[in-house]
Amino acid sequence: MLSKNIIYFGPNIKGSTTEKRIKSLKELKYKVNIIDSCRYYQIRKSILKAIQIRAGFGPVYKETLTTVLKEINKFKPEYLIIEIGYLFNINSLNKIKEKYPQLKLIFLTVDSIKTRTFQKFFFLKTLSLYNFIVTTKSSDIEIYKKYRAKKIIFSYQGIDEKNFFDYALSINENHLKSEVVFIGDYGKDRANTIKFLIEANVPIKIFGFNWNRYKFFKTFYFGPAMADDYYKILNNTKIALGFLNKEVGDTYTTRSLEIPAAGALLIAEETEDHKKLFKENKEAVFFKNKNELLEKIRYYLLNNEKRKEIAKSGRNRMKQHDLTWKSNIKKIFFELENNTN
């Protein structure tokens, strides 16, 4: 009989997807002990620690390992889930495996292995030491195989049940309402496309981080989308845009799921994953270039009933997909518990 004990090593940040996964595990009756990775390293917070992370050794690794070993000894978990894998080098994982050979090591990430954060040779060499890799990026599977990952589990990103709620806005929340919205951090490609849309008089609002650095977007930028404001924004727009991170080869993102779940019309970049998730022009709308995007935005702003029809079908499709974090975690652990490694 499996114990239901899990140690979860990741960023314990309010509102994060990590928090949602941990909440889901607890709802599924797992006992979860959280080790907050932010205690050991946060990006852009410490130059000295950043140098250690780049090198793959130093006091931060000893401190992390000491805490993890202490918690394993105290908590006696069946699984150790690690999100921030670059805080463990080969020596760290080997020591854990030697001392606790029955413990299952899981590397779980919703980010691409191709991001700069993970493109560290010492970290990539640790992938073969994990019993399981859980990834939300199908395009990364071959990379994990290249580094001799033992067992790879693919899962779609998850969404929160709050995505399906309808939100009435107060007078003070009117800035959250929009015709067209984009939620996401500044990026060069998406900024160029949004600039093109603005110059074509598209009534767009932008929420996210780092847009305030650029004077051109000042009038259209409304700050980050925090806590429940995020759900309110998506539930009170006509059209929400789904841009992808081309640097890491994204083929869908969490927002690809959250936008239709919230009842907005998703207009996103055309990819195979998007077309697997939604029927084109019936549950979501896709575009190949900025001119096509502009054309489709204009069309669906003018054709209100057609837009509502597709948005409603997209929302129903998301309910059928059942891609809440709780559902996804349940599926992941079904695979974990039915695979010996």
Residue ranges and their predicted role:
Residues L2-R54, P59-T67, F75, I84-N91, ...:
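Nucleotide-sugar donor-binding catalytic core of glycosyltransferases
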Residues I72-N73, K97, L127, L234, ...:
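Short hydrophobic patches on amphipathic alpha-helices
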Residues I81:
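N-terminal Rossmann-like NAD(P) cofactor-binding module of classical short-chain dehydrogenase/reductase
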Residues K95-F107, L129, L294:
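Charged, glycine-enriched surface loops/patches
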Residues L103-F118:
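A short, histidine- and acid-enriched strand-loop-helix "catalytic/donor-clamping" loop
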Residues T253, A284-K290, Y299-E305:
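Conserved acidic donor-binding segment of nucleotide-sugar-dependent glycosyltransferases
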Residues K306-Q320:
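A short, well-ordered alpha-helix in the C-terminal region of glycosyltransferases
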Residues W325-N341:
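C-terminal alpha-helical cap of glycosyltransferases
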